[in-house]
Regions:
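N-terminal subdomain of nucleotide-sugar transferases
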Residues: 1-152
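Glycosyltransferase donor-sugar binding loop
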Residues: 347-366
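Carbohydrate-associated surface elements
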Residues: 276, 297
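Short acidic alpha-helix that forms the nucleotide-activated donor recognition element
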Residues: 261-265, 381-392, 413
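Nucleotide-activated donor-binding/catalytic signature segment of Leloir-type glycosyltransferases, i.e.
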Residues: 241-246, 361-382
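Short glycine/serine-rich donor-binding loops of glycosyltransferases
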Residues: 405-410
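Aromatic "clamp/platform" in nucleotide-sugar-dependent glycosyltransferases that forms part
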Residues: 400
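Conserved donor-binding/catalytic core segment of Leloir-type glycosyltransferases
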Residues: 302-338, 349
Length: 421
């Protein structure tokens, strides 16, 4: 099939499949492969335009694949001011960002996709689609920035607000201006940028949309922002509970909340893994008539031939997961030091890809050296789950945020002890 053919399902995924391995990516790959009668388009949202290695071989029923960068390759702005009304643009952004206004979202979609002219006195010009630079590096963009800064965070550092605005609004307008594959249903695997793309596509293509959340996107982004050392709090509220001044960190959090509220309001179906997640979804506007639960599961027959290895030289604890901050691998390393005090010959295997966040991997290796755990902790890289499971006595999980981890279900097939810290 060609990219012009209509797919049955368009999967919209952010920062995940097929560039990143992990539980959600494996589930997505399985979901596509077990439905060979359906055709799938995949829109993989990435942070920037730099090429990435595809870690999964795309199934044969994938008819269209495209990567969508939030920050396209920078180009010199076109000559002439784009004929975008900065006041309308800024007010729409303010209402979308500050109040998750659905009408403002519609206005932004129109601005992103409506051909425009340019102010070129005495020179011929033609109407054309706006460039990404028109949305973040033009006179109308400057007007819109100032409207948002004054309304949303007047006390915050202006330079910090500028960069937050440029990053977040640039991402939003990339999503809203990107070409759309044709599909009967648009299925986002989170809220965030993926959720916005899915509900926009469904509206424009007169199709249906669904959102499936394993972890709750807004919670995970809030954790990322709280841990971020590139954000500096410049408004010191002390212990004041009712201080309503907003710092730039608050702007980031509010934008991600608005993404979710708009996506929930417009989606036809919202599914998640278990009931506790629905509490968070309801808090951001999801309705009971939209919501359902589909728990995680594994195919037990695939694990039937595995037998725990007996008489190993050392008792073995394993953590299976990506080496990224939200998995809190450093906490696993600290736990390994405690375990070694009780079981001196224990081996702790940290099993998973190390290339997603190289600086965090280096920090983890330094922590192993600091705690003198070189003979206890071993980073194995990615391994086949069926090969490693029989060697594990205990499965350890230290994630800050997890929904219903597949690795614990898989560990249960070997009757390995499972634990979370």
């Amino acid at each position: 099939m060609t990219a012009q053919d209509k797919a049955d399902v368009c999967i919209v995924v952010e920062g995940c499949y097929p560039f990143i391995t992990g539980g959600v990516s494996s589930w997505l790959d399985w979901l596509i492969r077990v439905q060979p009668d359906l055709t799938f388009a995949i829109v993989a949202i990435t942070a920037d335009h730099h090429p990435r290695e595809i870690k999964y071989e795309l199934p044969p029923n994938v008819s269209d694949f495209r990567a969508l960068p939030l920050a396209p390759e920078a180009r010199r702005p076109r000559i002439g001011r784009p004929l975008i009304d900065g006041q309308i643009y800024g007010e729409a952004l303010q209402r979308f960002w500050g109040a998750a206004d659905g009408d403002a979202f519609e206005t932004l979609c129109q601005i992103a996709t409506t051909p425009i002219g340019r102010n070129l006195p005495a020179l011929p010009w033609k109407i054309a689609q706006p460039d990404h630079a028109d949305f973040i590096s033009s006179q109308p963009a400057w007007e819109a920035l100032n409207i948002c800064a004054r309304a949303l965070a007047p006390e915050a550092s202006y330079i910090d607000t500028f960069w937050a605005w440029r990053t977040l609004v640039g991402g939003v307008m990339s999503i809203l201006s990107a070409p759309l594959p044709q599909a009967n249903i648009y299925h986002a695997i989170s809220t965030g940028y993926a959720g916005l793309y899915a509900v926009r596509a469904a509206r424009e293509m007169k199709a249906r949309s669904a959102i499936t959340e394993h972890g709750i996107y807004t919670n995970e982004r809030r954790i990322d922002l709280l841990m971020a050392d590139w954000l500096e709090d410049r408004i010191h509220k002390g212990f004041a509970v009712h201080d309503r001044r907003r710092d730039v960190r608050d702007l980031w959090t509010q934008m991600f909340d608005s993404f979710a509220q708009v996506a929930y309001a417009q989606a036809d179906r919202i599914t998640t893994l278990y009931g506790a997640n629905q509490t968070f979804q309801r808090a951001l506007g999801a309705r009971d008539d939209q919501m359902s639960i589909i728990p995680n599961g594994i195919m037990l027959e695939k694990f039937e031939g595995l037998c725990p290895v007996q008489n190993k030289a050392r008792p073995t604890v394993g953590l299976i997961g990506r080496l990224v901050p939200i998995k809190d691998i450093e906490n696993c390393i600290r736990a390994a030091a405690v375990i070694r005090q009780a079981v001196s010959d224990v081996e702790v295997l940290i099993i998973g890809p190390t290339d997603e966040d190289p600086s965090y991997f280096e920090a983890c290796k330094r922590r192993v050296a600091e705690l003198q755990l070189g003979d206890t902790v071993r980073f194995t890289g990615r391994m086949n789950i069926f090969e490693i499971l029989p060697f594990l006595d205990v499965m350890l999980l230290t994630s800050i945020s997890e929904a219903q981890p597949l690795v614990l279900l898989e560990a249960g097939t070997q009757r390995a002890e499972g634990g979370e810290t």
